[in-house]
Design a protein with these regions (language model features):
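Catalytic Walker B motif of ABC-type/P-loop ATPase nucleotide-binding domains
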Residues: 13-17
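H-loop/switch region of ABC-family ATPase nucleotide-binding domains
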Residues: 49-50
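ABC ATPase nucleotide-binding domains
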Residues: 86-107
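H-loop (His-switch) and adjacent beta-strand-loop-beta switch element
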Residues: 62-75
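A short, surface-exposed alpha-helical micro-motif characterized by mixed small hydrophobic
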Residues: 55-57
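ABC ATPase nucleotide-binding domain "signature" loop
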Residues: 20-22
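Helical segment within the ABC ATPase nucleotide-binding domain
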Residues: 27-40
């Protein structure tokens, strides 16, 4: 489907759960391709994801929803905060820094 999206040559690309049913290898590959579209072609990409760790690795900004409402939005480093994510998910969250990116550890 990436070829169809590129053929349309729009400035904005909206994707609803593009990683659904992909294994981890293919999910990472997809996110790397999308990241290149941003960096090399100047595309703005909005993606619905349910994996906060995937978002933290590839997104410039995150909009977090809770109960159908915007809970928080901002740069990835602003959203990837343990207290904010614990409130969002209603579970204790610990963050680890791996290669300069934050990863959630669910406890």
């Amino acid at each position: 489907f990436i070829a169809m999206v590129l053929a349309q040559d729009t400035d904005f690309i909206l994707l609803d759960e593009p990683l659904n049913n992909l294994d981890i290898k293919q999910s990472v590959s997809m996110m790397q391709i999308l990241r290149r579209l941003v960096e090399e072609l100047g595309k703005t990409i909005i993606i619905v994801l349910h994996d906060i760790n995937m978002a933290s690795q590839y997104a410039d900004e995150i909009v977090a929803f809770k109960d159908g409402q915007v809970f928080s939005k901002g740069r990835t480093d602003q959203i990837m905060q343990a207290d904010l994510l614990s409130q969002l998910y209603e579970i204790p969250i610990t963050l680890a820094d791996i290669n300069g990116k934050k990863i959630c550890i669910y406890s």
